[in-house]
């Protein structure tokens, strides 16, 4: 594909934005392959995945339209890689159990207690963040945690609405659309994008999961 883009399609350079190197080996593979293209292919390692990865593509397009080079776009995206955060509510622990990410005993106990774990993706790490006792509580945790992250680390952007929110779901869109209404009330006037959670994440957590993500608008062009 790179050969076609640089050849018959007539482009001078490529900005390639793979999923986070902490969650997949595809980024490292792309970096190795790019060595054969004499700097014409810039592979970005900005630790994004799913809906936040999409936002990186939109940022790259905006920067390219403003006249930035591929190298400048790569530098910006990697410099601002920590300007994004994802929280994921896991609906059913059996998929994490099958993948060896939680013990059978732990999964059984959590199911009995009705616990809905909330995971966090920040940078290259996916970590356990909180334990909710209901879907309602998990949603509240995600929304409050996004507000806390923004108010502490990006106060000016938060107060001036310079950020983007994304909701992602696995399998069923309807709960995501309902969640969107709640998020709109909590973050009035902010653009909210809804889409499928990427398969690379969904396959580990199963159907019925919801994610809430934020990406700070750091572009000044």
Region spans (language model):
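Mixed-charge interfacial surface used for oligomerization/domain docking
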Residues: 3, 13, 22, 26-42, ...
